[in-house]
Regions:
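ATP-binding/phosphotransfer module of carbohydrate and carboxylate kinases, centering on a glycine-rich
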Residues: 1-121
Length: 121
């Protein structure tokens, strides 16, 4: 949201459905999905940065997969499609096919993890 607000400020003459309203991350993804060019640009920049970060993590840890959770994961393919493409751009060849998926526990993952720690394995 902070980056989108900055992009709006830097592009005062560019039309955007988010201009002049209070918005959340979900609104940025919805606007991008609906064809808003400035929102799509922000999603592309964000997924590029995240893809680069995941590629760096993959280079040092060789994970079986990346699971993206929280509210942002509900954005669906408007998030995951460009993220996967950017990731493949930055990842070493041996890591390029590492799956990037939405976490199935959503926002409750922390609660489940805490309970498991308390109860024990």
């Amino acid at each position: 949201v902070r980056c989108m607000k900055k992009l709006l400020d830097e592009n005062p003459g560019t039309p955007c459905t988010l201009r002049g309203i209070d918005f959340a991350a979900k609104d940025v993804f919805d606007a991008a999905r609906s064809g808003d060019a400035l929102a799509a640009r922000e999603v592309d920049e964000m997924t590029d940065t995240l893809g680069m970060a995941l590629a760096s993590i993959a280079a040092t840890t060789d994970p079986e997969m990346f699971m993206i959770g929280g509210g942002v994961a509900r954005a669906g393919e408007v998030l995951f499609d460009p993220l996967r493409e950017h990731y493949k751009t930055y990842a070493f060849k041996s890591c390029r096919e590492t799956p990037i998926v939405a976490a199935t526990l959503g926002n409750d993952a922390g609660i489940y993890g805490s309970v498991r720690l308390i109860v024990g394995e």
